[in-house]
Amino acid sequence: MSLLQFSGLFVVWLLCTLFIATLTWFEFRRVRFNFNVFFSLLFLLTFFFGFPLTSVLVFRFDVGVAPPEILLQALLSAGCFYAVYYVTYKTRLRKRVADVPRRPLFTMNRVETNLTWVILMGIALVSVGIFFMHNGFLLFRLNSYSQIFSSEVSGVALKRFFYFFIPAMLVVYFLRQDSKAWLFFLVSTVAFGLLTYMIVGGTRANIIIAFAIFLFIGIIRGWISLWMLAAAGVLGIVGMFWLALKRYGMNVSGDEAFYTFLYLTRDTFSPWENLALLLQNYDNIDFQGLAPIVRDFYVFIPSWLWPGRPSMVLNSANYFTREVLNNHSGLAISPTLIGSLVVMGGALFIPLGAIVVGLIIKWFDWLYELGNREPNRYKAAILHSFCFGAIFNMIVLAREGLDSFVSRVVFFIVVFGACLMIAKLLYWLFESAGLIHKRTKSSLRTQVEG
């Protein structure tokens, strides 16, 4: 890449970054937090944060990258995607009408809410316990990270349930919403994330997500400033780099350490070059339509129920890795959100996907606002826990693609909804057995006076 070509790419990158950052800043000033702000920051991180890192790798370490025209296509496609997304998100689908009292779809009380978070936590802890009994601490047993996807590891499906520890702790926080509950959320979820990091053999997702949710809650409540957020972000990047070194068993120093930091940080937070690599192989793609979305549900079907289930699920990531790049290393290369749309339908699917994503984020913000307006604090805690718990799925959306997001968010909704139903059933059984006594104002007054 020549200096002139880099200058042209830099101008495009700068304009796109300023465009998205400016809109995000105005939205932040207006509401302080919503899921549009979160997704916008996530989009910036995924598609634009990596450009400076790539530039240093190219000019400092002479690393090969896709041709400049392909990199330009990647930057422009990301900028255009966000423009369509933003217009869709801001478009009002119906006229605003005065709030009319409606019969709520469901309601929650104190016992049901506490039962819900206990069940969610139980699912996570039991899954971790069973996985540990089968495999032990994989971080200290396996020689390479790719081995966690091999037949040596049993009970892989259980990993999908680990994440429900975070929504459980979110319910605990939203029931109190004070600084002690906020710090308890951080300590408990990060400790659980470190435990799963050692047991699974290097998966950092639970740690990243717990830390991100902690920071956003702090921003919402005014407990941390933007400067503190930036400092925490730098600390998070360094922490993720250290965990990556441990995961891959690397011992580096000097220039090699700087080089390793650049490419691991880029691959962890901003896999934008994967999109460029996919666009470089555009002519080799046999568009898959909506099949990757359907195929991604295969992983949730146990083999005993479907003996002929394919051993390799050909979602957009696996199709890109195996069929387009002919890479059979065992690790799937993340195609990113835009890349998954290209795999499904080419360039035409990019604006269509942007419209779909705009509606998805709009729906999450509607739920979030519903929780903000909800007078029943127990129901509000459940709604907020569901919304913030879905942050993991939004990260999957940006990094892995629309197909992976759809299957995971449906799984999340089903499990979360099942926990709610079980909690309500248990409450009904306990109440029928006379084990639950409703609090009265007189008893509460007596407790206060005592």
UniProtKB/Swiss-Prot annotation:
Recorded coiled-coil stretches: none
Pfam families tied to this protein: WzyE (PF06899)
Bilayer topology annotation: Multi-pass membrane protein
Keywords: Cell inner membrane, Cell membrane, Membrane, Transmembrane, Transmembrane helix
Principal subcellular localization: membrane
The UniProt record lists the keyword Transmembrane helix: yes
Subcellular location, record wording: Cell inner membrane
GO BP terms in the entry: enterobacterial common antigen biosynthetic process
Source taxon at top rank: Bacteria
Transmembrane stretches, start-end: 6-26, 37-57, 63-83, 118-138, 155-175, 181-201, 207-227, 228-248, 341-361, 378-398, 410-430
GO cellular component, one term: plasma membrane
UniProt pathway annotation: Bacterial outer membrane biogenesis; enterobacterial common antigen biosynthesis
InterPro entries named among the record's database cross-references: WzyE
Self-association state and partner proteins as the record states: Probably part of a complex composed of WzxE, WzyE and WzzE.
Protein family per UniProt: Belongs to the WzyE family.
Protein role: Probably involved in the polymerization of enterobacterial common antigen (ECA) trisaccharide repeat units.
The protein's name: Probable ECA polymerase
